[in-house]
Amino acid sequence: MAIYNLDDLLDKYSAEFLVLDFNHLFISSTIREEVWLLQRKKDSPLINKILQAAREFNIHEASVDRDLETYSGGQKAILACLLTLALIVDRKIHGLKLLLNNVLDSVSDENRSKLLQEFKEICSTHDIRLFTEKNGQIREIM
């Protein structure tokens, strides 16, 4: 059974994992605000990295001030993953256990493969472990 209540999801997994949940991908309304909340730098170079990566996923209309709610569900999932990947590299994070809850299921097969390749590169250099949750079971995928 999938967990759809954020409180239940965090109660169950947040002590062990960084949780990226499809139903709660962002806490602000634009990429610029999201990056500012995470880095507290105006117009961080991280923004350009995210937008460039978004173009590689054919999200050509991505912009720093576009309301995140105007993207499709799959586009939001991709942007959240790209933001997470960029932060891992930027902050030199190692040893993280990342739980993608209903995130990979929301993107096309092609984009899922591309995202997993991006994660694979980061996982190998930053000792990151990647997990998914399905039917109440955690499965390590990388």
Where is each model-derived feature located?
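Conserved ABC ATPase "signature" region
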Residues: 47-63
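Loop/turn-to-beta-strand initiation segments
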Residues: 94-97, 125-131
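Walker B catalytic motif
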Residues: 67, 95-111
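Conserved ATPase "switch" residues in P-loop NTPase domains
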Residues: 120-124
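ABC ATPase nucleotide-binding domain signature region
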Residues: 1-40, 135-142
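GG-anchored amphipathic helix commonly corresponding to the ABC/SMC/Rad50 NBD signature/C-loop
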Residues: 74-99
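Conserved hydrophobic alpha-helix in the ABC-type ATPase nucleotide-binding domain
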Residues: 111-119
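Conserved ABC ATPase signature
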Residues: 67-75
